[in-house]
A protein has these predicted regions:
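N-terminal accessory targeting/assembly segments
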Residues: 1-115
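Conserved small/polar residues in nucleotide/adenosyl-binding loops
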Residues: 157-161
Length: 161
């Protein structure tokens, strides 16, 4: 059964991670990671660590190879982070795999931005727009939530007549 790990109400320490593949992207990725630090700080969350991870190839499961994924897991344990925040856009399956690996909540940049908008929405219309954006973001992440019911047999109802 698939389990959605909810963000704790109060995340105190987050570890920031940015994965890049081309060495020429390192400077740009560092700048984006610094910007992500400011975004996360705006939510009142302390930064436990910032890590720029170089990966040779893009992999479907974790975005990086399993060796680099284990390295990120160890870094999260070492800095005692409550949450791992990725600068990269994670697919729903990648987010699930990371949550299983690090056993903490895992979010990406888009979710951080949605949280900031949600906190700053003042009007009813703004609140509804943010809620719609959150639902659109969450929908693919819930797609496999009820898989445990897929293999249950169909109950046929027959009338007594």
């Amino acid at each position: 059964m698939f389990e959605i790990r909810e963000k704790p109400e109060m995340v105190e320490r987050a570890m920031l991670v940015s994965i890049y593949f081309d060495p020429s992207e390192a400077g740009e990725k560092q700048a984006m990671l610094d910007e992500l630090e400011d975004l996360v700080s705006n939510l009142g969350i302390g930064i436990a660590g910032k890590h720029l991870i170089k990966s040779r190839d893009m992999h479907a499961k974790f975005l990086c190879g399993t060796g680099k994924a284990q390295e990120v897991k160890q870094l999260a344990l070492d800095c005692r982070a409550d949450c791992v925040v990725f600068d990269n856009m994670l697919s729903p399956s990648q987010q699930r795999e990371w949550e299983r690996l690090v056993d903490e909540c895992v979010i990406d940049r888009e979710e951080v931005i949605l949280d900031i908008f949600a906190r700053r929405a003042r009007t009813r219309e703004a609140t509804l727009q943010v809620e719609l954006a959150r639902m659109q973001y969450s929908l693919p992440r819930m797609a496999r939530m009820w898989n445990h019911l897929d293999r249950q047999g169909c109950l046929l109802y027959t009338s007594p007549s």
